[in-house]
Amino acid sequence: MFLKFFFAFLTMLASTQLFAQYDVPLYTSYTTEAARAKMNERLIKNSITKNLLLPLSDSTEENWEDAFDAMEVMNYHAPFVQSKVEAAFDSIGVRSVSFQRALMELAYANYPGKFIMQTNVLLEETTDPKIFAVCAEYLLQHKKTDAEKQILSKKLLEKFTDTAYKNPVLFMLSTRLKSADVNQQPVHEVLKDIVSKNFLPGQIVMYSFQRKNRDYPGMVLIRNADGNFVRDSSGNLFHLPQLARSISNLPGYLRNGNTPQGIFKMFGFGVSMSNFIGPTANVQMGMPVELSIQKFFDDSTILDSAWTIGWYQKLIPKKLQSYLPLYDSYYAGLAGRSEIIAHGTTIEPDYYAGKPYFPLTPTQGCLCTKEIWNGKRLESDQQKLVNGLLEAGGANGYCVVIEIDDKQAPVAIKDLLPYLKN
C-alpha cells in the first residue's frame, strides 16, 4: 500500500555514541526542488489518475486504495478525483472491509460532511466494529451534538450488545459518545502529578503536551532520570514544537489516527529508509500490547505474557487511575495500532500550506518535529530532540502524550510553566 511503503521505517537501533556524533550535515537527493516536482507528477499521474481510471472491482480495490492514500498525503482535490470518490461510495456496501476503511478515512480527511447519507447507510449495514466506528466518527465530525451522540450510542448497543464493552475499538467509541464530563479530574490537577518526580520515578520521560484540536502543534519537553527537566545552555527549559496529528485526523484508537494519549515505552534511536521520514535519527517507541510486558517494563524477570489493564496501571499513580485519557495508548495497542514513533520529516510541507500546523507535516499517527530540506537538511528540530534526549541520558524510558486543553493555538511554553516548578 502507498502509505505503508512511504512511511515504513527500518529499525536500526544504535548506540548513544553513534548518535552523539550524528549532528552532521545531511543530504537527500529526493528533497531537492526538482526531485519533489517529479515526485508530485508521479503521484498524480500514476498513484492517483492511473489507478482511478481502472474500473472498480474486487481485483482493482487495492489500486484505488493506493490512490486514496496518495490523495490524503498530498491533500489533493480535483473534480476528476471527486467524481471517482462519489462512484466509490455508490458501491461501498459491497466492497471489502479494507476498501471501506480506506474510503471512509479519505472522506474523513478530505471530504468532511459530503457523504453523510452514504455513511449512515454503511453504519446501519456493517457488522465490522472498526467500520462502524469510523462511520460514527465521520458523522460526529459533521454534527457533534449530544443528540447525535445519543443516537449513535443507541445504535452501537443495538448492533453489538454486550460486546461493545469488550471490543477495544467499540469501547473507545462509547467513551467518546458520552457527555464531556466523563473525565472527573480537571486536567490541570492531572498535569501537576504527571510532571512530578514521583511519576515514573527514575525514568527518562519525553513529554508531548498537545491541544485537543491536533491541527495545532504541541510541545515536547524532556525529564531526566533524576526528575529534572532538561535545560539549554542558557538555563532555559528545553522545548520544541511537536505535531501529534495524523494525515486523516481520526482519533487515536483508529488505524492511521492521531497519536493516542497515554504512556509509550521509549527504547532507543533508529534510522528510517522512508522517503517521507528521512535519515535524521528517530525515537523508537511502542505501546502496551504492541510490546511484550517484559519489554514495556524493561524487566526480563516478568513471567506473565498476557497483557491486562492491571499491568498498565502499575505505571499510573493511584489518584490518576480514573483519568481515562491516560489509557488511550493501552486501548490503541489492544486494537492493533503499532509503529508509532517520534521522527522528523522529509515530506513536502507545501502540501499543507495554510494549515495551522504548517510547516510541520502530519503523519500516520507518529509524533513529528519540523525539518526543512532542499537537498540539504536546512533546519532540524528532530536533531535537537535527539540531542536533548542524549543530554537526559538517552532514549530509554517512557514517552507521555497528554492533551492540556482545547485552546485554538499552538502550545507555548508559557502554557506549561505553571506545572513545571520542580
Model regions: which residues?
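Bacterial Sec-dependent N-terminal signal peptides
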Residues: 1-22
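Cyclophilin-type peptidyl-prolyl cis-trans isomerase
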Residues: 356-375
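A short acidic, amphipathic alpha-helical/loop segment
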Residues: 118-122
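Cell wall/extracellular polymer interaction/catalysis modules
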Residues: 22-76, 80-86, 90-101, 105-109, ...
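Amphipathic alpha-helical protein-interaction segments enriched in hydrophobic
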Residues: 132-133
